[in-house]
Amino acid sequence: MPRRRVVAKREILPDPKFGSQILAKFMNHVMVSGKKSVSERIVYGALDIITERKGLDSLETFEKALDNIRPAVEVKSRRVGGATYQVPVEVRPSRRTALAMRWLVDAARKRGEKSMPARLAGEVMDAAEGKGAAMKKREDVHRMAEANKAFSHFRF
């Protein structure tokens, strides 16, 4: 156990347009090299594209996409007697959201559309419908956990 004191979680200010803390956190995941205004423009642009194409509430679509991507279990490496086992463990809620956001941004960056807002909008809409690269990543993680269920007694 570390002897230092436990660092308190910093309060994240909600985003200015929608007043959503989750969206503000997502903007921080999109941000590169500390350029927050650029990440805001990308995220708001993506949400505008979603509203334009779907005619639905873009924030609801975004939250539905995040819910679909959130993993329930993941595997962690555990070394036991010279062998390394992939042990399935439950993911705590804060990490679920962080992983979902990371996977969503990574999948959007790998897409083929011209602009980042278009890529992000496409990935969010796909994830809301239960498809896309971010959903595939979640399914792969769940499949790995299912395949290694036999080692779950090596819990941490």
Curated annotation (Swiss-Prot):
Entry keywords, A to Z: Ribonucleoprotein, Ribosomal protein, RNA-binding, rRNA-binding, tRNA-binding
Gene Ontology MF terms: rRNA binding; structural constituent of ribosome; tRNA binding
UniProt entry tagged with the keyword Transport: no
One Pfam family this sequence matches: Ribosomal_S7
CDD domains cross-referenced by the UniProt entry: uS7_Bacteria
The keyword tRNA-binding is annotated on this UniProt entry: yes
Family matches, as PROSITE patterns: RIBOSOMAL_S7
Subunit structure, interactors included: Part of the 30S ribosomal subunit. Contacts proteins S9 and S11.
Protein's name in the database: Small ribosomal subunit protein uS7
Upper lineage: Bacteria, Pseudomonadati, Pseudomonadota, Gammaproteobacteria, Oceanospirillales
